[in-house]
Design a protein with these regions (language model features):
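A glycosyltransferase accessory/donor-loop signature
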Residues: 1-188, 305-306, 312-451
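Glycosyltransferase specificity loop/lid
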Residues: 206-215
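Short active-site oxyanion
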Residues: 200-202, 258-259
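Conserved beta-strand termini and adjacent loop/short-helix elements that scaffold enzyme active sites
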Residues: 6, 205-207, 226-230, 286, ...
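Hydrophobic/aromatic residues located in beta-strands of well-ordered beta-sheets
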Residues: 97, 202-203
């Protein structure tokens, strides 16, 4: 047996995680095309047709998952690149990775499905090379957009669509739990996806809080229903809004699908996004700092991933007590989608309230459109909610509603409780003489006559 020492320059200690995962990049290339810092690699031509690669994985934080360590990322990428090149781009040689260290390999790169052995601080993998190729063609961080906005993306799309022996099983998925407050939102979401001529399945995970009547409406809207037991967020406060948000982890149990795009049920889709299924897990849009927003993301369902997430949920923290904080600690190496794939309805500049016309989706933060009158965005009636107010975005949601069959519209009915709340805050807005003047708008919403 012949062995080689693989030599490569260690990445500079000056390179920090935030350099690889900046909060913002110039997606439109208005001033310059975004570039990622270089992570040195070996001279790969010197190490061809290896049967196995053995590496010691660095670990700054022993026993803590989600370590944002640039050197750790470098070692994992070196091993992945060596394996892909040794396996060959057009052949399927068996190659193995042996990774040693207390922190273990980065599971974003080395899939648990490919693991042959794990004993203490030793991991052995026989990777599926086509999957690994997709990973190494990605930028080294969220410092650049990937597919399909670059030649890399075209290569991945080509590999992904032509080398698999079967048509990938793909679906959009959302989750409803704990109450029926978002049933209307989920119906509108399904209808909006259908209105873009999507060809993918629609799957909705629902717990026991969703009534048979609502399930009937959700099915009629296009969702395939799968019943689930909700999962409590171990770091959330009792009765907090995100107390049961870990129920989202159930999407990793959808093993009937190769990939799913999760979308929160207070979204509406305005442009077809089927092409984004060509991205690998975990792809999402940026949020604050180096974290991603879990409102829209692509994942690859897997029994072992779900089991690992469930096991780690008590050990790994969450900055916000909910699923987004937890998932950002579990998937520290993620891929940036364009921000227009998750356009947040929030405005820091009060003068400009229109969302971009080319937005793929809109995330309706604040008071939801179906809890307001059709006539205007009721976020205007509360000073603390005005950052979420946009009449144009509100109108776009109601355009989706108007295209829905009449039988589905009843699930978006205005309840007496909703009406009373709106009237209460309209009166307060009038008394305060709020300058936007929306409280002056005559109400013509016909839903007021249905209760």
């Amino acid at each position: 047996m012949e062995t080689f020492d693989v030599k490569f320059p260690k990445v500079s200690d000056k390179l920090k995680w935030k350099d690889l995962f900046p909060e913002w990049i110039d997606e439109n290339e208005a001033s310059a095309k975004p570039k990622c810092p270089e992570i040195p690699m070996p001279v790969f031509e010197e190490y061809e047709e290896l049967d196995a690669v053995v590496a010691k994985v660095p670990c700054k934080h022993v026993g803590v998952d989600g370590s944002r360590d640039v050197f750790r990322l470098q070692v994992n990428l070196v091993v992945a690149n060596l394996l892909v090149r040794s396996g060959g781009w057009n052949k399927n040689r068996r190659v193995y990775a042996v990774l040693i260290g207390d922190c273990g390999p980065m599971w974003e790169i080395f899939r648990c499905e490919d693991m042959l052995l794990h004993e203490e601080n030793l991991w052995v993998y026989k990777p599926e090379l086509e999957k690994l190729k997709q990973k190494i063609l990605m930028p080294v961080g969220s410092c650049q957009l990937a597919l399909p906005f670059s030649k890399q993306g075209q290569e991945i799309q080509k590999n992904y669509s032509k080398t698999l022996f079967y048509k990938p099983r793909e679906a959009y998925v959302t989750v409803l739990h704990s109450s029926e407050a978002y049933v209307c939102g989920a119906i509108a979401l399904a209808q909006s996806i259908i209105q873009t001529n999507s060809t993918r399945d629609l799957v909705l995970l629902a717990d026991d809080s969703i009534s048979p009547k609502s399930l009937h409406g959700l099915r009629a809207a296009g969702w395939k229903i799968k019943k689930i037991k909700r999962i409590r967020s171990p770091h959330a406060k009792k009765n907090a809004y995100n107390e049961w948000n870990y129920s989202k982890l159930r999407i990793w149990q959808l093993k009937d699908y190769d990939k799913v795009i999760f979308i929160d049920s207070d979204f509406v889709v305005f442009r077809n996004i089927d092409k984004f299924f060509s991205y690998p897990e975990l792809s999402a849009t940026g949020n604050d700092g180096y974290i991603f927003n879990s409102g829209v993301m692509i994942v690859e369902p897997s029994k072992c991933k779900f089991q690992n997430l469930m096991k780690k949920r008590f050990e790994v923290g969450s900055y916000n007590g909910g699923d987004q904080g937890f998932l950002n600690e579990m998937f520290v190496w993620w891929h940036r989608w364009p921000s227009k794939l998750n356009t947040l309805k929030i405005f820091r500049n009060s003068r400009h309230r229109n969302l971009p016309d080319d937005s793929y989706t809109v995330h309706y933060l604040g008071l939801k459109p179906w809890t307001c009158y059709k006539d205007y965005d009721c976020n205007w009636d509360k000073v603390e909610s005005q950052k979420f107010a946009s009449d144009s975005a509100h109108e776009r949601w109601w355009k989706v509603y108007k295209k829905m069959p009449m039988a589905l519209r009843e699930y978006c009915a205005l309840t007496p409780e909703m009406d009373a709340r709106i009237i209460k805050w309209r009166k307060k807005a009038k008394k305060a003489n709020l300058l936007d003047g929306h409280w002056r708008i005559p109400v013509k919403d016909s839903r007021r006559l249905t209760y």
